């Protein structure tokens, strides 16, 4: 799995003594060699025994297992990350399936809620509104100079938990951990950022330990100007950056994406990443059953930016399979808390309006004005049901059984995060459909045993998509993230499905294979970027070489001392 980094050229390091031990990207702890301990003034600062990284990882894993709950395990892993990043990623790589739910969803949600209470050490940048005139200076203060990927949030819509203020920083930190662990992007290239624009969470404002700006959220023109000041400063500091918008509220997420997607290399993971992994899963599910997505009808519970983003990708795939735009949109039903979205409902957002059903199309449904999800199941007869509502338990037994009455093999994706917000549990879905439902979830669930059969539950996790996209963008030197690049990522993921390959098991690949999956997605993304003129054309073998050259591995390099 790991190559010998001692065969690579040494790194020339200007730090020594305690300063070196306190630099997470460079610290080796007990693995510093005798020569390095002498050359870098480390003698006497470390125990005598010199260890390998694997020995360190084994000790760290034993310590990890000694903690009794996932929150304590999360804090422990973050402490390792803040003291020795190479060891952190070696440990995470060795136990990715076990540790992913601890370092990211669902545990990261609780970590965001408790951010100010569990705060240990600074990581990333906190850009606060009162400091809006000094953003350029703050970017210069970043501990990492050659930044290639930024994940930024304003903390307003953290998972399904709402406004967490600067506690939302846990999400960029977690996401970038996955860029490295799953996509091989060096941690030296990754910078988490939170835009502190205040919070409307009264509990945080009243908390004496809350570390953010104690002020109601700014909005409107003030907010737009502040975000733009940040974007322009980033472009000046790192003009070739890949910037990922993360967990912005619905009223800001799509407008920000539309404003900046043609100005710099950026994407919104909640809208586009979620859409890409969901579409890849749906393509795989349809292929496994010998059908096309364009032959299916799809119902959504949740018509926010994430749900509508998924729906638009589904429409694009249906059109690629031969349907007209109108035909594809007629097969998609968006349901929000007021019922089915039709063209007669007032005050729709622009992205919702494009997906609303004309009332003429459903004129023969024997229903009232507010058409419920259950009525959509009965009269729309969808084959696919996707939940992005953030509200638990809304896929009721009656809803699911009504769907199953009209569809022998329903595809049901309750995608809301964290686990406490899921629309239905896989065990219930499988039981209510007598084992016929093909289920994928947003949070991790254990396999389900039903009538002597074991059902592996795929986690429709964005970590299958965004690390590969990031690796592909960096390897190709792409200047934009386009819809076609995202579509190529979805199709590449579908090709990696065990079910599509005729194998037993999950709809999505095993996390143990994530490096191979990310490399393949990266190559398809890079090739598409080149075809669209967003990257310089190079032969396939050069793309492969660039992907490998940019794929960082958690191994210690040899150090040589130099001066600043």
Curated annotation (Swiss-Prot):
Gene Ontology terms: biological process: malate metabolic process
Sites where the protein binds a divalent metal cation: 246-247, 270
InterPro entries assigned to the protein according to its UniProt record, in alphabetical order: Aminoacid_DH-like_N_sf, Malic_enzyme_CS, Malic_N_dom, Malic_N_dom_sf, Malic_NAD-bd, Malic_OxRdtase, NAD(P)-bd_dom_sf, NAD_malic_enz_proteobac
Annotated Gene Ontology cellular component terms: cytosol
EC number: 1.1.1.38
Positions of the record's site feature: Important for activity: 270
UniProt superkingdom: Bacteria
Record bears the keyword Cell wall biogenesis/degradation: no
One Pfam family from the record: malic
UniProtKB keywords: Metal-binding, NAD, Oxidoreductase
Active site: 104, 175
SUPFAM superfamilies recorded: Aminoacid dehydrogenase-like, N-terminal domain, NAD(P)-binding Rossmann-fold domains
PROSITE patterns: MALIC_ENZYMES
Reaction equations catalysed: (S)-malate + NAD(+) = pyruvate + CO2 + NADH; oxaloacetate + H(+) = pyruvate + CO2
Annotated residues for binding of NAD(+): 157, 270, 417
GO molecular function: malate dehydrogenase (decarboxylating) (NAD+) activity; metal ion binding; NAD binding; oxaloacetate decarboxylase activity
Note on how the cofactor is bound: Divalent metal cations. Prefers magnesium or manganese.
Reported cofactor(s): Mg(2+); Mn(2+)
Similarity remark: Belongs to the malic enzymes family.
HAMAP family referenced in this protein's UniProt entry, alphabetically: NAD_malic_enz (MF_01619)
Assembly and binders: Homotetramer.
This protein's name: NAD-dependent malic enzyme
Organism for this UniProt entry: Aeromonas hydrophila subsp. hydrophila (strain ATCC 7966 / DSM 30187 / BCRC 13018 / CCUG 14551 / JCM 1027 / KCTC 2358 / NCIMB 9240 / NCTC 8049)
């Amino acid at each position: 799995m790991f190559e010998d980094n001692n065969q690579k050229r040494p790194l020339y390091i200007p730090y020594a003594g305690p300063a070196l031990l306190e630099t997470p990207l460079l610290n080796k702890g007990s693995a510093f060699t005798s020569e390095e301990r002498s050359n870098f003034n480390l003698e006497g600062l470390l125990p005598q025994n010199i260890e390998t990284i694997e020995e360190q990882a084994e000790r760290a894993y034993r310590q990890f297992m000694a903690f009794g709950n996932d929150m304590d395990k999360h804090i422990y892993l973050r402490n390792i990350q803040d003291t020795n990043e190479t060891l952190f990623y070696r440990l995470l790589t060795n136990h990715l399936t076990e540790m992913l739910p601890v370092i990211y969803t669902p545990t990261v949600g609780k970590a965001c809620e408790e951010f100010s209470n569990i705060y240990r050490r600074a990581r990333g940048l906190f850009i606060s509104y009162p400091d809006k005139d000094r953003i350029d200076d703050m970017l210069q203060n970043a501990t990492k100079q050659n930044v290639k990927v930024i994940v930024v949030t304003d903390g307003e819509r953290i998972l399904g938990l709402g406004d967490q203020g600067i506690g939302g920083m846990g999400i960029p930190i977690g996401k970038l951990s996955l860029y490295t662990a799953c996509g091989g992007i060096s941690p030296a290239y990754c910078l988490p950022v939170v835009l502190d624009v205040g919070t409307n969470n009264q509990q945080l404002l009243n908390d004496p330990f809350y570390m953010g700006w104690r002020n109601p959220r700014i909005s409107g023109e003030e907010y737009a100007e502040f975000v733009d000041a940040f974007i322009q400063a980033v472009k000046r500091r790192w003009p070739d950056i890949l910037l990922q918008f993360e967990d912005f509220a619905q009223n800001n997420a799509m407008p920000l994406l539309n404003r900046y997607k043609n100005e710099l290399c950026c994407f919104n993971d909640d809208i586009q990443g979620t859409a890409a992994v969901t579409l890849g899963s749906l393509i795989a599910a349809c292929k496994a059953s010998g059908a096309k997505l364009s032959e299916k009808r799809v119902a959504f519970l949740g018509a926010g930016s994430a749900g509508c983003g998924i729906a638009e990708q589904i429409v694009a795939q249906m059109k690629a399979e031969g349907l007209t735009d109108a035909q594809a949109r007629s097969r998609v039903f968006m349901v929000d808390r007021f019922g089915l979205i039709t063209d007669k409902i007032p005050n729709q957002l622009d992205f919702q309006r494009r997906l609303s059903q004309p009332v003429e199309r459903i004129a023969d449904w024997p229903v009232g004005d507010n058409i419920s999800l259950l009525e959509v199941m009965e009269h729309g007869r969808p084959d696919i049901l996707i939940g992005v509502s953030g509200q638990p338990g809304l896929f009721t037994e009656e809803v699911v059984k009504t769907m199953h009455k009209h569809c022998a093999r329903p595809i049901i994706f309750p995608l809301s995060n964290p686990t406490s917000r899921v629309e239905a549990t896989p065990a219930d879905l499988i039981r209510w459909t007598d084992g016929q439902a093909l289920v994928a979830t947003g949070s991790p669930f254990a396999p389900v045993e039903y009538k002597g059969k074991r059902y592996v539950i795929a986690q429709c996790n964005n970590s299958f998509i965004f690390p590969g996209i990031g690796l592909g963008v960096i390897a190709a030197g792409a200047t934009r993230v386009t819809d076609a690049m995202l579509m190529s990522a979805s199709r590449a993921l579908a090709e990696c499905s065990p079910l599509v390959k005729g194998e037993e098991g999950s709809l999505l690949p095993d996390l143990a294979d994530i490096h191979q999956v990310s490399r393949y997605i990266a190559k398809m993304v890079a090739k598409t970027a080149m075809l669209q003129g967003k990257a310089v054309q190079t032969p396939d073998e050069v793309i492969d070489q660039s992907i490998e050259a940019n794929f960082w591995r958690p191994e210690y390099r040899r150090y040589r001392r130099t001066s600043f």
